[in-house]
Amino acid sequence: MRLIPPINQLKQWILAWQLRGQQQLARWGIREQTLLIGLSFIVGLVAGGATWLFEQTVKLIENYYYLPLANSTHATTRWPCYVFLPLIPAGGGLALVLWRRLWGRQKSELHGLAGLLHSLSRESGKLKASLGIETLVASSLTIGSGGSAGPEAPIAVIGASIGALCGNTLGFSRRNMPILLGCGAAAGISAVFGAPIAGVLFAMEVLLRDFSVRTLTPIVISSVMASTMYVGLSGGGAARGIFQMPTNGPALAFTFGQVPYYLLLGAVCGLLAVGFTRFYLLVENYSQKHRSRIPYFLHPAIGAALSGVCGVAMLIIFRDDPFLHTRFAQGYIPIFSDGYPTILRMIDPRWYSGVHTIAGHTINLTLEFLVVICVLKILATSFTLAPGGSGGVFAPALFIGAAGGGAVGLVLAHYGLVSDPATYALVGMGAVLAAAIQAPLTAIILLFELTQNYAIMVPIMLAAVTATVIQQLLVGESLYTLPLKKLGVKLGAAVGISALQRIGVDQLVLLKAQVARPDDSLSSILARSHLDGEEDFVVMDKTGNYLGLLTIDDLKTVLLEPEAAPLLLVGEVMRADVPPIKFHDTLDAALTMFGRFDISRLAVLDDVNPADKTPALLGFLTRSELMKRYQQELAGDLTV
């Protein structure tokens, strides 16, 4: 008797447990949709706890690695010692590489939220639960060592992996797995900002692109639970997150005469988002292009070192500023890490009015300071993340928007057109975010929840929509979808596309496929087609490797010249350009292939065989079967 390997035996036990559990729930009359509601509470609570753990891990690395090294080497206080500053984030980059190698995972072409979007759009939410642990440590190393990145995207990925773990454990169907991932992602964003509604909209507008009631309910529950859990663990009072608004926020008052100014602000923020996106893409393309010349595992460290050079530039430019000199002595560089403390100063009116003084010097945020940190933040973030660092662009986008908006506010205030530049910094913060991630609704509601003031709505709506349109016209994609576009993956919107993304080929009825060999004559294929009524054939070699398709259109062409059929071989006329579809691919991927190659059938291959075996041919997927299943799913969504 052959012994079953322990790992396979464990998988069999888990599968058997799932099947027994599903059967028992069915006996009790508990549907998976009902179970999803209950599970959303658990996902939200665990994601809220994971957010707190992530925050503490970042602080731990910052307090026991970055600050001791910065202070002991005088890297932020003395000119000759500035050269040591880039080495500190570079060390974090090397630690990141070692962690990934230890974990057995290398940076793929799609990571972070781009990887999560790909999983949702092409794999029905298929996500490894271990990705959460890998992301927690990797992003903590990047941000805690001074890398310019935000915690929001990592926390969203961690939350999604928690949802994936729960769904996989209970054997959830592909229909509901994306919703669980959305629950986790919404929970993470909610906990970061203490903004449950923004978390819900982020998951539905950016990730799922699905606003159906069936999707909304569990995501709302997870978002609220995560915010509640984080507040409980952090000891906060009201619903506050990692990012907390200043107690003296800008005086929000809107008049019709300010419309042109906010449209101008939106245009500036849109151009900033375009510049940020294009430079990020430039660095990423350069890194990928030079993989062979520079060992790829060194790229995160080199990028982190370059972000450190940006910090050195800031030290040199502002070393005579009394306030910044004090902050530099504490090891703080405004463009490093998430930049939250600097964002809070930029949206606080007191930092524009000369209320603060240090050693007899009045402290004001100047136009020079805002412009410089805006440019340096774009550079530092691109150098940190594009070569392989782990983190998000959410916080950098807020930082860039606050700096750009504050600069616009100062210029307008100089000419007596406005009285409070901090308001423009606040609105600019949301406008750049809306443009960079192409999610204006999320940005609008996020600012409303942060300020808890309805007066912000019209200004941010004007600026966010203007900025988003400019980004759409000049770039056409967000920072999250650009990597997908490079791989030929297009994301749709609304319920229809969502339905295609959550249904797998494995849920459809396949037709039996007839196999032809490349050395078969076309006359023999025509005879088989006439005898059996077959229209399409899968062309495979003798070892079972897929080579292409022979379609009815190819046969019709031969029928016009039947005397040539005995002289032609299948391999000479087959469609070698048509790839097969995998058994666990989504209908979205299948529909894309149907449209791209203009065919009515696709060969379906098994994708669960060991790597050393040839994938088995399972049958044909027809376009008509796909559309029939799609209409059924769409009708179900609209009636929920």
Please place each PLM-identified region on the residue numbering:
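Alpha-helical transmembrane segments and immediately membrane-proximal extracytoplasmic
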Residues: 1-502, 506-507, 511-512, 516-528, ...
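Tandem CBS (Bateman) regulatory domains
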Residues: 480-514, 526-530, 546-602, 607-640
